[in-house]
């Protein structure tokens, strides 16, 4: 009798294990798994639903990364179906698994604030100022009820990586319209604001003040080609700038410019995307290029595949940057991992 009981218990344990595995597999396939399998799920799947470590869909659009204390921090737009809900921040040690940290910058309840509920905050980027020991956030701001006519840069500050950030001000840099934007800190610690201006016809760059809170008068037009979504990075002494065309939420062809100095001259060298649907940036739009810590000459291209009917459901396209004769390109991959940085030819 004991022998039969042991056999029955063994069969029951096996049946429970198989059932549990099948249920977990189904949950993962359906995007309903409450946790991520951190032992096995080490790959990027561009355009697929991406959940955080709590099983919630990551909500950080038009964003950028900051690497600090051996951790990556991802700042991006918190979006409802259409509403702008502030700026979220996530953290990760490996770039695959992201923990939600906080709503780093919230819309204000003060009806006189530039960032009161109903405003639009887009493309947030955060940099660290070593002199002031402050984290500084810049973003594209549109005032409540003004459509896209305000065209301002917003600035916020925090003592902590995860915030909360305190909104300081919004303005037009040197009187120029400022829409899609990015930040870049050069090797000497000087920071720059790259932004679309004059109804997006001009791409401009302005050097920031030492505290990173304002622009200086060193502000110049890089080129006038009706571009937006700037993503700037540096490699082997050259500066590279990836931008998109201006077609609303619809994807379009990316463009690559190269320069020896940030203020130019900048040379246009074509579309850096290759592979299926490259002429539409794989259905996405550039937002940031991140150097990969611990890997030589490794860069991550970040883009958003916008869903204008439900902005919260816009997907993320993360792909490795490759180089040929010092000219970067981004090739489509359905799935990849960080080992690709070791095998691609830079």
Regions found by a protein language model. Give the residues of each.
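Carbohydrate-active catalytic/glycan-binding domains of CAZyme proteins
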Residues: 21-346
């Amino acid at each position: 009798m004991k022998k039969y009981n042991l056999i029955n218990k063994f069969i029951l344990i096996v049946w429970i294990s198989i059932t549990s595995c099948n249920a977990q597999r189904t949950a993962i396939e359906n995007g309903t798994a409450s946790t991520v399998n951190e032992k096995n799920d080490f790959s990027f799947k561009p355009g697929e639903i991406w959940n955080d470590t709590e099983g919630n869909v990551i909500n950080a659009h038009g964003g950028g990364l900051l690497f600090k204390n051996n951790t990556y921090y991802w700042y991006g737009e918190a979006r409802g179906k259409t509403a702008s809900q502030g700026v979220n921040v996530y953290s990760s040690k490996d770039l695959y698994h992201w923990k939600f940290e906080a709503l780093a910058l919230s819309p204000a309840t003060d009806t006189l604030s530039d960032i009161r509920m109903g405003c639009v905050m887009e493309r947030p980027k955060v940099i660290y100022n070593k002199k002031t020991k402050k984290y500084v956030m810049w973003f594209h701001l549109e005032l409540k009820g003004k459509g896209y006519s305000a065209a301002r840069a917003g600035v916020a500050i925090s003592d902590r990586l995860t915030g909360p950030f305190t909104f300081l001000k919004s303005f037009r840099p040197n009187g120029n319209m400022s829409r899609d934007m990015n930040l870049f800190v050069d090797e000497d610690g000087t920071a720059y604001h790259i932004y679309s201006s004059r109804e997006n016809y001009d791409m401009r760059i302005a050097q920031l003040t030492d505290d990173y809170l304002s622009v200086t008068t060193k502000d110049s037009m890089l080129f006038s080609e009706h571009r937006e979504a700037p993503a700037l990075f540096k490699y082997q002494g050259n500066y590279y700038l990836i931008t998109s065309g201006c077609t609303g939420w619809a994807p379009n062809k990316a463009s690559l410019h190269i320069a020896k100095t940030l203020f130019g001259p900048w040379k246009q060298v074509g579309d850096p995307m290759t592979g299926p649907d490259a002429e539409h940036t794989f259905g996405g739009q550039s937002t940031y290029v991140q150097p990969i810590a611990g890997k030589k000459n490794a860069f991550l291209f970040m883009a958003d595949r916008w869903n204008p009917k439900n902005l919260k459901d816009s997907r993320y396209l993360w792909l490795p940057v490759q180089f040929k004769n010092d000219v970067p390109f981004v090739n489509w991959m359905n799935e990849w991992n960080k080992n690709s940085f070791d095998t691609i030819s830079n």
